Amino acid sequence: MTKYIFVTGGVVSSIGKGIVAASLGRLLKNRGLKVTIQKFDPYINIDPGTMSPYQHGEVYVTDDGAETDLDLGHYERFIDINLNKYSNVTTGKIYSEVLRKERKGEYLGATVQVIPHITDALKEKIKRAATTTDSDVIITEVGGTVGDIESLPFLEALRQMKADVGSENVMYIHTTLLPYLKAAGEMKTKPTQHSVKELRGLGIQPNMLVIRTEEPVEQGIKNKLAQFCDVNPEAVIESRDVEHLYQIPLNLQAQSMDQIVCDHLKLDVPQADMTEWSAMVDRVMNLKKTTRIALVGKYVELPDAYLSVVEALKHSGYANDTAIELDWINANDLTAENAKKLLGQADGIIVPGGFGQRGTEGKIQAIRYAREHDVPMLGICLGMQLTCVEFARHVLGMEKANSFELDPDTAYPIIDIMRDQIDIEDMGGTLRLGLYPCKLKAGSRAAAAYNNQEVVQRRHRHRYEFNNKFRQDFEAAGFVFSGVSPDNRLVEIVELPEKKFFVAAQYHPELQSRPNRPEELYTAFVTAAVKNKNQSL
């Protein structure tokens, strides 16, 4: 029988529900259980694919092509699993599906209501996420906070699950903020008490509290919370601020969180062996070197827009025994005149993805600087496309070369719209999304990075591609197409082999990086940056 764990939040948003859920998932996985995890987002968008990065952060893409919340990146990195489209559910997605069924007459003339139709659809998504992955345990995080009007159908569905599958198969975990008032010199439990009161008013009694705090919590405070919130004192778990996120699973295990969960759900499984994870954390906490990477982007005011890129760089840093120091460079501010000032101290340059014209000329200048000064450079998605544009302009003499996306009237459309995208009008959910194969060129930098594999599978999110009309011109000038689709139609990786490291990929390698298993192309880039730093000393 599948076990269901529901994680809700109270008092304030952004208190780390996703990290708590992911950490618990890692602990349960290390007990030998097959775990999956999903995120409920109560916004009305179908998915975050068309949302501004300034509002939502990055869009995380799954193997099967779902555009999802960035928390799924945390889930995959912590638990080391590949999630699917059932792992992110929004209000918009649920209402869209219910209304589509209503139009088809599938409700046989019934009045369509929040209860039972919306709540039934939500419960079906929970169960589908578990069955499609054949999981022993599914953890469902509900975005937002208890008391938000848009969360009510989600919480009602969670309440109903207890009756549907039995109380011994359901556990409710409530995460809240425990504020510390410096003036009074004490922690305040009242916000948590009111949050739990609100949750109980909706028919959900939490079985565990996870309290986010900056200071250590005395047992007396935990006892008070247990008494007023009707949970066992040992089920009041402290989630204190840490230096590194990957410490959190170990901190939760030290408080027997996973054992309490297993006892409640009647799971008789071995203790979690966190030896490898602990060794990884020790390595992270004791890095001996620092490597400086310039990240040139258009959304740098909100680092969450590049969350997976940053994490992948860190993972590859761990493998090289180096911390990554990021210089956040706003592409809008970068010009040929100030490129040396902004980029001259970097050991490596990364140009990540994006959409639209703003900032593209600055990114092109960053790529040009990397090429002309032989600074290790990694381009991702739009960064790969602009790598091709830069080469066309400044090496091949195609002065007005551009992407069709950025200039439909360009005489040299180095990057063109994909053929199967030409007649598509909708923006949402219509990109080339998900896992696709990439055939590697033997002897190339890319092939070496991937241990000379012939084919790798990586996740994509794009609508434009390299225009093959220009392929011979590029190759004649020494530009290498080191990764292509198996049918040789789509360019996936480009490089200049004579440089220290000058590689760009159409796909998003960062989406498959893990703290204990860094993505190979990122690792090759960071390794080159470390070597470049050493040569400059």
From Swiss-Prot:
It is an enzyme of class 6 (ligase). PROSITE patterns: GATASE_TYPE_1. GO terms for biological process: 'de novo' CTP biosynthetic process; pyrimidine nucleobase biosynthetic process. CTP binds at S13, D148, I149, E150, K188, T189, K190, P191, T192, Q193, K224. Coiled coil: none annotated. Allosterically activated by GTP, when glutamine is the substrate; GTP has no effect on the reaction when ammonia is the substrate. The allosteric effector GTP functions by stabilizing the protein conformation that binds the tetrahedral intermediate(s) formed during glutamine hydrolysis. Inhibited by the product CTP, via allosteric rather than competitive inhibition. This is CTP synthase.
